[in-house]
C-alpha cells in the first residue's frame, strides 16, 4: 500500500518500485517514477508519481532495524575483533547490500568504513561454502561458547 495516495500495489510492482527508487540515504539527484496500482478508496486503477524521497520514507523502519542490528552486533563484538573491523570496515553481502545508500547510512551511524562485497548476491553462499571447506580450521571459532 502506498499510504500517501492510498494506492494498493501488486507484489511485482512493489518490487519494481523498490529496485528503481529505494535508497537508505539521500541521493545526489532524487528520481521520480509513475506507479500504477488500485485506488484503495474507489477500487479503480490509478497512476501516481512517486519519488525516491517517498520510497525512502516508506522503507525507513526496516532500514533503521538493519542499522540497529549492526550497532548491536558491534556492541557485542570482542574488542580484538572490533579493532579489526574499525581498521578494515564493514563488508555488506546479500541482496540488501544492493540497496542504494546503505553503505553511506551505515557509515553515518557507525563511523566505520562500509563496503559492498564483490558480487554481493553470491557472497553469502560462497562464504558458506568456504567455511564448509575450511571447517576443521574454523570449528573452534564457529562453536566457541558465549559462556566461556
Language model features with spans:
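Residue-level signature of catalytic and energy-coupling elements of molecular machines
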Residues: 17, 70, 92, 128
Amino acid at each position: 500500500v502506498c499510504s500517501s495516495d492510498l494506492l494498493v500495489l501488486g507484489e511485482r510492482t512493489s518490487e519494481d518500485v523498490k529496485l528503481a527508487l529505494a535508497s537508505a540515504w539521500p541521493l545526489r539527484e532524487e528520481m521520480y517514477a509513475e506507479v500504477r496500482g488500485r485506488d484503495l478508496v474507489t477500487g479503480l486503477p490509478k497512476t501516481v508519481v512517486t519519488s525516491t524521497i517517498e520510497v525512502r520514507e516508506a522503507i525507513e523502519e526496516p532500514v533503521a532495524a538493519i542499522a540497529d542490528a549492526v550497532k548491536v552486533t558491534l556492541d557485542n563484538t570482542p574488542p580484538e575483533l572490533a579493532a579489526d573491523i574499525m581498521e578494515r570496515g564493514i563488508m555488506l553481502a546479500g541482496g540488501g547490500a544492493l540497496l542504494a545508500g546503505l553503505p553511506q547510512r551505515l557509515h553515518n551511524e557507525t563511523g566505520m568504513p562500509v563496503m559492498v562485497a564483490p558480487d554481493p548476491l553470491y557472497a553469502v553462499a560462497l562464504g558458506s561454502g568456504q567455511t564448509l571447506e575450511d571447517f576443521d580450521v574454523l570449528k573452534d571459532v564457529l562453536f566457541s561458547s558465549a559462556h566461556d
